[in-house]
Amino acid sequence: MATNPTPRIGKAQRATKESDIQVEWNLDGTGKTDIDTGVPFFDHMLTALGAHGSFDLKVHARGDVEIDAHHTVEDTAIVMGQALAQALGDKAGIRRFGDAFIPMDETLAHAAVDVSGRPYYVGVGEPEQMLSSVIGGHYATVINQHFFETLALNSRIALHVRCLYGRDPHHITEAEFKAVARALRAAVEDDPRVGGVPSTKGTL
């Protein structure tokens, strides 16, 4: 739990002809989630993100999932990134960097985060089958990379996600989401040794 007297909460919403998204993200939460995107497996992943990041996360989304889940997932990432950026504020007192290795059965994933204000994404190591696998009839695993990249760009963080090895598309996806959750949790935690913004430039 952060020592901030006021919880760091970001709220954002976005409505287009393809989707309608509302997000509330509390960085100083306890892992409570309220997720409803119309894509059950994506709900499962966002629930894991909140729970393992110890974030209170509310995501309500409606999109054209009867056509494809891609619009809903990518638009949700946009709004989540905006909410995360708002919650981070001036970033004073945070650790800034975080990383995590997460195993899931035969899979091992790693994520590293720099809350730098310089958005960048690198995703490597997913096996070729992730380009064509579909989970639950709606979630195409090729969307993983789009989600993480869009989240990073809109929250203005540098995010690196690696699948070191794995076979099952479900396990690979879940390990990646949990690794991002843990890395982000570490990066946004209060650092009692840092009184201001964790940068030699004085700003992030």
From Swiss-Prot:
InterPro entries documented for this protein: IGPD_sf (IPR038494), ImidazoleglycerolP_deHydtase (IPR000807), ImidazoleglycerP_deHydtase_CS (IPR020565), Ribosomal_Su5_D2-typ_SF (IPR020568)
Chief place where the protein resides: cytoplasm
Its annotated compartments are: Cytoplasm
Can you name one GO molecular function term for this protein? imidazoleglycerol-phosphate dehydratase activity
Task: Give its E.C. classification number.
Answer: 4.2.1.19
- What family is this protein classified in? Belongs to the imidazoleglycerol-phosphate dehydratase family.
* UniProt name for this protein: Imidazoleglycerol-phosphate dehydratase
